[in-house]
């Protein structure tokens, strides 16, 4: 298919009826034009049987156009684009995802945005079946690990020093003085 033909077809492709659009002043979703496609994709992904080992991570969907949802994340292969959070199995199969739309990306559960995203993405996992969820330091916190443990989901992740709460640990300088292989 030629480029011209593709853009002609794309011009008439609409997921939502433009006559039924909510007012620009009303409190509408930022992704309202593609929401039916996203929800259909999410529902089909949730029918896949979950794997025992799951990973939660962020991904940038490359995009160079203009959009209020476009994010910049340094140290990624594609710095500019739409930020999405996803849960994938050990085989690499995606089981659930959410597109970042700001503070209202998911409901507030008191764990901060990153913790709330992990809880939202693991909602569809059956409870008390000892699924193992892995995440990097962006998502990890002690309250999140406790919340997942209450649901019977095991969690593994690196916790940042500023998310340790009132845990009395040695500073990095003190650990360096004690030598290699020492722990707190």
What are these regions (language model features)?
Residues 165-184:
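An anionic, glycine-rich sequence signature occurring as long contiguous blocks
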């Amino acid at each position: 298919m030629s480029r011209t033909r593709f853009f002609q077809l794309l011009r008439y492709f609409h997921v939502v009826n433009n006559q039924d659009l909510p007012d620009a002043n009303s409190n509408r979703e930022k992704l309202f034009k593609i929401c039916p496609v996203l929800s259909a994709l999410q529902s089909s992904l949730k029918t896949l049987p979950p794997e025992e080992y799951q990973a939660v991570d962020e991904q940038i969907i490359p995009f160079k156009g203009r959009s209020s949802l476009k994010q910049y994340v340094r140290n990624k292969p594609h710095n500019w684009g739409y930020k999405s959070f996803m849960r994938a199995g050990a085989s690499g199969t995606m089981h659930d995802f959410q597109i970042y739309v700001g503070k209202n990306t998911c409901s507030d559960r008191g764990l901060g945005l990153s913790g709330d995203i992990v809880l939202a993405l693991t909602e569809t996992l059956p409870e008390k079946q000892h699924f193992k969820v892995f995440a990097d330091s962006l998502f990890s916190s002690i309250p999140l690990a406790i919340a997942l443990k209450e649901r019977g989901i095991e969690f593994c992740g690196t916790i940042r020093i500023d998310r340790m709460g009132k845990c009395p640990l040695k500073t990095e300088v003190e650990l360096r003085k004690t030598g290699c292989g020492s722990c707190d």
